[in-house]
């Protein structure tokens, strides 16, 4: 789960990390009132969407008068903001953050992220803040410093000091930078985040350290422990199909291809998508129905997939363990009838009650393309796409 910048800054503020004063706004009038309340003389008008690169896309602007705040708010609110993270379709801006301007002397990059190789948290810092960390990693990788944190000790003063020194924080500001780094690590752990990113963390002219951006990603599986974070959820920023799928406990992620995939098990789902790519096409989605799928759940999965106009073929790939093949077959038959299926359907089933499942499909009278192996299923789905 992602949240907006202003929400992330509220979490940082509560954790004791210095952030600029800011007020969210949903209308131009609210933006003007926010600027008046903050007092100026310089404000930052920032688009709030769940994507990075807003500045380059024209979603972050400086204003030096209330009239300019009003003008910029009117331009940014409602715009379709395109960044390197949104894709060419962009995202509609429905919220703004009106914030005090900052006296920026130096910009740094700071993040806490799950490092799967070490199975620990990695604190990542760079002296090149304010720009895409991916660009820094590509152009000057030596400017990215990583410190792996032992969960038994947390980020120690020695480690935080090492990081602050490595990115050139002046001696007079080192103690505050160390404090901020330790608090970023702590808030990462306390909120069950998968990413906390401050880009940039700045050094002001008076020597103070401040976080002027905040990006949080949270582990969905831990949200039951954090109702206060769930309250930040903005469904307008999420894929409608993914929101709909979550209502039925379906693990669904939209992709750019044209073969809809319905699979049980995340590993098999990823292998299915890889096999589709191997044979020259692309999956339209990741969809794991899990081990407890019912015919009703399969029907909803079909409905969600078919809402995507790019889907030209559906591929069902089931390994029956906990999930029985006859249950999936009954669900597929019910789904085909419920949605009046008008695209080719390829089905491959192996495992528990396999023969019964195949018998149900064969006797259904539906034009189902049967496959024996995953490779066979993928090849038949790709052939159907090319013939469409």
Curated annotation (Swiss-Prot):
Ligand binding (ATP): 46, 53-55, 99, 102, 107
Single GO molecular function: magnesium ion binding
Cofactor(s) demanded: Mg(2+)
Catalytic reaction list: succinate + ATP + CoA = succinyl-CoA + ADP + phosphate; GTP + succinate + CoA = succinyl-CoA + GDP + phosphate
Keywords assigned by UniProt, alphabetized: ATP-binding, Ligase, Magnesium, Metal-binding, Nucleotide-binding, Tricarboxylic acid cycle
Pathway: Carbohydrate metabolism; tricarboxylic acid cycle; succinate from succinyl-CoA (ligase route): step 1/1
Enzyme Commission (EC) number: 6.2.1.5
Residue ranges of domain ATP-grasp in the record: 9-244
Cofactor remark from the record: Binds 1 Mg(2+) ion per subunit.
Pfam families, alphabetized: ATP-grasp_2, Ligase_CoA
Residues passing through the membrane, by range: none
Biological processes annotated in GO: succinyl-CoA metabolic process; tricarboxylic acid cycle
NCBIfam families assigned: PRK00696.1, sucCoAbeta
Subunit text: Heterotetramer of two alpha and two beta subunits.
Protein name listed in UniProt: Succinate--CoA ligase [ADP-forming] subunit beta
Organism: Albidiferax ferrireducens (strain ATCC BAA-621 / DSM 15236 / T118) (Rhodoferax ferrireducens)
Taxonomic path: Bacteria, Pseudomonadati, Pseudomonadota, Betaproteobacteria, Burkholderiales
Gene (UniProt): sucC
